[in-house]
C-alpha cells in the first residue's frame, strides 16, 4: 500500500544505499581485523628468540622469511587485500629484509654466520620475467588472437560436438579433453588453451547461474589432475620417477607404460569424481546448453596467420621433447608473430591480466627465497621422518607436500621432499613393504603436489582460471580441499594396492 506515495521509490533507494554503506563498513572492519591479525602474528614470529623455533641451524634471515611466509599465507587466505597486492608487497618485503640489497640497519651488529644466506635481489626481481610468466603472456596473447579471428568459436564447436548439448556432458567434455592434453603438454599451456575454447560457451549460459563457475573450475582441476597420468605430465612425476629408478638408489626400473598402467586408471577415476563434485557444488540452471555460438571463423590473411600460428604452437607444445624447444620458449612464438603482423595491437596488450602475472610472480619470489636461504631444506630436515611409523610417514609426507605445494611451486616442493624421503624410505623398505613400499611414499608426494589447488597462487592453471573473473577464492578453496582429501586417499589406496607389480 505504500507504493501510492510518489516518493516511495526514493525512500526505497535511500534504504538500499544505507544497507550498502553499512555492508561496506562491515567489510572494511573485517579487512582491518584480518590485516591486524596477519601483521601481529608476523611481528611476533619476527621478534621471537631463534631457539623458540626448534630448527637446528636456523639463521636470522630464515627467521625473517618464516615471518614473511606466514604473513603471505594469512593475507592470501584472508583476502584482506587483493591477492596480487599481497604478492607485490611480499616481493618488496623480501627485497628489503632478506636480499643482498636489504636495508643496511637490518644487518648491523649481526655476524655473517648468524645472519645466514641472503637471497640475490636479482633472483627475486627475475621472478617477474620467469619462464612461466612468459608462458602466461603467450597464453593470454593466443587467447586474444583466437577470439579476434573467431578461432575459439570454431574449435569450441568441433570439440564439444561429441558431448551433445546436455549441460552435464558439456562439463565432462571439457574435463576429459583438458586432462588428455595435460598428460602430454604443460599444465599451464593446456589451461591457457582450454580457457580460450571455454569463452564462447560461457556466453551461452545465464549470467546468474552457478554452472559458469563449475565450467571455469573444470579447466584448472582437470589440468592439475590430468598431469598425473603420465611421467611427463608434470615435473613432480619425473622427479619421483628419477629417484625410484636411480641405479645407485632404489633402482626399481619403473617404465613409462608401467607408470600409466596404474596412474591412468587412478587419474580417470579422480576426473569423474571431480565431475560429480562440480555438478553438486555448481549445478546448472538449465538441463541443456544451447550452443548457438555466434560468429564464424574469419578468412582474411591475418586470421589465417592466427590459425597457422596456433596450430604450430600446439604441435610444438606437444612435441617439445622431440624438438628440444621448451614449452615456455614456444609460448613466445605467437607473441612475436602476432605483434609483427599486426594481429595484436597496443590496445590488445591492455587486455592482458597483468594483475595475475604479478600475483604469480609473488608466489615464485617466495619459493625462490625459501630455497636460496636454505629455510625450506632446514624445515624438511627438522621433520624426523626416520622415527615415524610407516603409516604416519607415508600419510604425513603426503600431507606436508600437499600443504607446501599450495603456496610454493609444485616442482620445488617435490624437489625438496623426494630426495630426503628416498633416503629415509630406503632405510625403511621392509617396514614400508606392507603398504606398497617406497613407491607409495614417493609417488604419494607427486600425487600430493598435483592435488594442491586451494588458492589462485597454488598453480598457474588456477591463476589463469581466476583471471576469468568467474571464480572466487572461496570456490577454489572448497573444491581444492574436497579434491585433496579424496584424491590423496584414493591415490594411496591405488598405489599401495597395486604394489607396482605389473610386468
Say what each PLM segment does.
Residues 23-26, 200-284, 461-494:
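Membrane-core helix-loop-helix motifs of multi-pass transport proteins
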Residues 56-59, 71-89, 95-99, 124, ...:
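Flexible hinge motifs at transmembrane-helix junctions and intramembrane kinks/re-entrant loops
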Residues 85, 89-209, 355-356, 360-432:
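Membrane-embedded alpha-helical segments and adjacent helix-loop junctions characteristic
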